[in-house]
Curated annotation (Swiss-Prot):
InterPro entries per the UniProt record, alphabetical: Ribosomal_bL28, Ribosomal_bL28/bL31-like_sf, Ribosomal_bL28_bact-type, Ribosomal_bL28_sf
Domain of life: Bacteria
UniProt protein name: Large ribosomal subunit protein bL28
Key word Ribosomal protein present: yes
Species of provenance: Methylocella silvestris (strain DSM 15510 / CIP 108128 / LMG 27833 / NCIMB 13906 / BL2)
Length: 96
């Protein structure tokens, strides 16, 4: 399982921990990922994702999972999230 957010693409970063004496130690900065179940209003079902906590705030800010995926760039989304996005857009187009 990769350490990458399914919705924002946030992943592991590398860098240095720098002490007061300017001693540098290489380290990995891991994203704060959690397994969540989000509800799609359009599909009327639950969808499981592994997302960063910051992504949860972004989903709520944009007005829910459906609105977030509609505006999200496909390059940032995981394959599963892209499939859900296509389902949502297809169902919205059929309803219109």
């Amino acid at each position: 399982m990769s350490r990458r957010c399914d919705l924002t693409g946030k992943a592991v970063q590398t860098g240095n921990l720098v002490s007061h004496s300017n001693h540098k130690t290489r380290t990995r900065f891991l994203p704060n990922l959690c397994n969540v179940t989000l509800i799609s209003d359009v599909l009327q079902r639950k969808v499981r994702f592994r997302v960063a906590v910051a992504a949860l705030r972004s989903v709520e800010h944009r007005g829910g999972l459906d609105a977030f995926l509609a505006k999200a760039d496909d390059a940032e989304l995981s394959l599963g999230a892209r499939a859900i996005k296509r389902e949502i857009l297809k169902k919205q187009a059929a309803a219109s």
